[in-house]
């Protein structure tokens, strides 16, 4: 891989790596290598879901994908933004880079992987910069951090008489 990584630890592909919040939790607990849930051409199969259920016994339904390709892509873009923001704000990485890697997992045949929708999925993960969803999430971050304000006043006897004036003057100033 051409990317830097802090530790070779992280979740293997599975249902737990298909949702953004699970990827974020794994990151916060030290995961840095994320093998994303395997996606495939047949993203609308009707199978028992969740694919893995272990309430009293465990089973796994193969050839299953709980989210469509577009839903999977959206989850990975959300996670990507969240991890970058967390790292930038809280400096989790000691590297000059992000220190984590997303690794795609695709299946299950070459013919399936070569289909138009799978190829689009792969190419959009390789370079998301022109994808509308990536641009939308990038634009969500607002420049205005606070649009409202609360003015506090001392409540001694003299100030109580002038609170009305103070509110007017502070409101006009802001």
PLM ranges: what are they?
Residues 1, 13-174:
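Active-site entrance/lid segments in N-terminal catalytic domains of soluble metabolic enzymes
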Residues 3-10:
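Short, basic, glycine/proline-bearing loop/turn elements
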